[in-house]
Regions:
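Short terminal alpha-helical segments
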Residues: 2-24
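Residue-level detector of well-ordered alpha-helical segments, enriched
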Residues: 8, 34-41, 56, 85
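Helix-rich interaction surfaces within compact, conserved domain-sized segments
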Residues: 67-105
Length: 105
């Protein structure tokens, strides 16, 4: 279903929770993602902030593809609470980032 591994989303969430100290690392990590992973990441975040429902994942994904004009790092960092939205989005999609986050610590 998702075009990005949960472990990658978990890593982004961890960086997001420490954005003041980890912005450079977050930007570097996001640069390693391919286009499909970036679109999926944005769709997950939108679901987590209630812009789309979990049932509308593919619609959110298509919207992310159409509206991708800002670099993913800039868009995420410019979105307040993006890490919380990513966690919520994964939960709504039936996946938890908690185990993946713990394995990365």
């Amino acid at each position: 279903m998702l075009d990005i591994a949960v472990t990658k989303v978990a890593q982004i969430i961890l960086y997001g929770h420490e954005i003041d100290r980890a912005e450079a690392e977050l930007r570097g990590f996001l640069e390693t993602l391919n286009e499909d992973e970036c679109h999926s990441l944005i769709a997950i975040m939108w679901i987590g902030r209630d812009s789309f429902s979990a049932d509308e994942y593919y619609e959110a994904l298509e919207t992310a593809k159409r509206e991708a004009v800002t670099p993913t790092a800039d868009y995420l960092i410019g979105t307040p609470h993006f890490a919380d939205h990513l966690e919520a989005g994964l939960e709504l999609l039936g996946t938890s980032a908690s185990d993946a986050e713990q394995s990365l610590l």
